[in-house]
Amino acid sequence: MRRFYAIVLVFFCSGCLAQQDIQFTQYMFNKAFYNPASVGSANSICVKLLMRQQWLGFKDDAGLTVAPQTYLLSVDAPVYVIHSGVGAIIYQDKLGYESNIGIRLSYALRLHLGEDNTLGLGAGFSLLNKSIDFSKFDPRHQGDPMLTGQGSEFCYLTDFSAGLWLQSRRSFYLGLSATQIRQARGVIGPSEIVLKRYYYLMTGYNYALRKGHTERQIFLEPSFLVSSDGENIQFDVTGLINFNDQYYGGAGYRFQNAVYLIAGLKFRKFFVNLSYDITLPASNGISRHDSPEIMAGYCCGLSPPVRKQSFYNTRFL
């Protein structure tokens, strides 16, 4: 039964035309994956590593892990001289006997709206290598037309993304974006692959619960993510408590899917976060499998260059 479910799962995401975007619990620390307009908005050079194990302990009959596994490396930074931000993401997403290796490059033009607000206009380019190892399947019926591939087969897909990112100084952010805009198509074995277009709305706020001395500051940081492929809609709502920008923790809810816990520690320019999804009981009788996710990173703040004040002699005006 597990092998059958794994096969159905793989081809639901690949052979049946739908390539879904990757799901992350720590979306509030991984904004660039969802919205290219957010790159450089932290005014820091940030390098982040993330690993997610979906459905912990889910294996096939041979004991092989067929649950989704995701590894991600991201870098982004502001480029003040051209009022912009740039970013790059490399990731691998494994699902059963399917592997996706992708690169996303992002650029954002940052416009100042008054002294406290900036608006980012972003665009991104993505390259995806999708492969399926047909040799690992054990079909119940020889000659199954869905499993006629030989060995590992792959295809390359290119696509684009775009977004808007409004941000005030530390307090508030709001982003709208679309990924996989052109819905690129490819063929692996007998199956046509289509990258589904996704729409995202992300927002968050930093509210000071206690102000005062540096060592006593406490902030409430709620955030909200809505995603849709035009047919289905999913949302996450999360609340974090941040103690002096050093320790933080909280919880969240993913609609009809999971509740999750998040904890993090920041030491100087380094940070590490851990989240754990507690999957809600399924109505279809499938056993519950939880999902851990860990992120580590380094952020070095960059200050915009200070303009030198010029003085003019009125004689030459």
Report each predicted region and the residues it spans:
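Positively charged n-region of N-terminal signal peptides that target proteins for export
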Residues: 1-4, 113-115
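Intrinsically disordered, low-complexity regions enriched for glutamine and histidine
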Residues: 3, 17-18
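Sec-dependent N-terminal signal peptides
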Residues: 7-8
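Subset of outer-membrane beta-barrel
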Residues: 19-317
